[in-house]
Amino acid sequence: MKKLSVLSLLAVVILGMMTACNNKTKAQESAKAVNVIYMIGDGMALPQVYAAMLASGEDMTFQQFPYIGVVDTHSASNDITDSAAGGTALASDHKTNNAMLGVNPDSIPVKTVLEALAEQGKKTGIVVTSYVTHATPAAFYAKVPHRKQYEDIAVQMAENPYINLIIGGGMKHFAQRKDSLDLIGRMENELGWKVYDNLAEVDVTNQKYAVIADTNHMPKAADRGDFLPRAVKTALKTLDNAENGFFLMVEGSQIDFACHGNDSTWMMDEMMDFDYAVKAALDYAKEKGNTLVVVTADHETGGLTLPDPQGKYTNVVFDYSTGSHTCLPVLVYAYGPGAERFTGWMQNNELKAKIMNACGMENISDSIPKEPKKRFKAVKANLDSNSNN
């Protein structure tokens, strides 16, 4: 009888714990996100993440995310996207043609999640290790028919009323321009920016600043040290007191660069660097409780696989099938209020709506366009050709 009473008491305690946990989960899922940290590992799919785990022998921050989904990355024009079309889809509701930035296939400008949330009163920021005018960051603020219009993109960035801070490289598009425009001078004297060339000099009380810390892209991870995680922490300190919350986009830009070169050592350095940046974001979100963190990629680069060439299942190597992009899906990882929306299979142009909805806001955009009718045409043609050989 006594044993039965103890078991009954234990059952009540366990049931109470399960109910409390369930209520906590429901409360977290019903809460609205005040802040959003949107992180993009350029060129990063599951092979890159798992390769970093294997080679480092360490757990990755990615493993801490409670919600994971699969993202289809094809563009409006191709089964394999470039970073311009991929970035535009992640930033807006629109798939566009490769090389196009911030516009749909008909060259009509589209509204990005950064712009939409800024219009709702949120502060915004961008942190990258590429040019600040490179395809992925530019997809959040620029509207140009071709991604290589760097000087035009720089002007659009300078004149953008929605960006409160931006950190990265690419000073040559501002200060060494073909049109001889002193864009830095104009930014500081006419457009309200404070421009730094060193992250350590930043005054986080400034309401609008740019850190353009290199003439070109930032150096490789092995040479730039902890620039990216420090930049994320600096941005978070700046945005922390935003009255209506904030939106921060962070890109691990050079994972893609390394995979284009099939350089595994460089790729590993960039993956670990990006993981440290993700940790900084996740730590902030766990402390605040009102911050949604979404981590994904624009595409996979390199066709990375992890085989054993000997077929003995003992010696894993990094093996690349291309020096370019692939059509492999990528993953999306989510934590915080609204994170449960980021599960299952989705298109890359669905993430903006999920973020807006997580913030308790109606998605301010056109309806999501239908899938291109000729999807996988090139793949099917290749399969048909191979079957005839």
Regions found by a protein language model. Give the residues of each.
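Bacterial N-terminal signal peptides that target proteins for export
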Residues: 1-9
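Metal-dependent active-site segment of extracytoplasmic phospho-/sulfohydrolases and closely related
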Residues: 46, 272-311
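Structural motif
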Residues: 38, 211-213, 247-251, 294
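Gly/Ser/Thr-rich active-site loops/lids in small-molecule metabolic enzymes
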Residues: 266-282, 313-326
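N-terminal catalytic scaffold of extracellular/periplasmic and nuclease hydrolases
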Residues: 22-177, 183-201, 300-389
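Active-site His/acidic residue clusters
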Residues: 135-141, 215-220, 232-236, 240-245, ...
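C-terminal motif of bacterial Sec signal peptides marking the signal peptidase cleavage site
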Residues: 17-20
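A Trp-anchored, charged/polar loop motif used as the substrate-binding/catalytic surface
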Residues: 193-196, 225-240
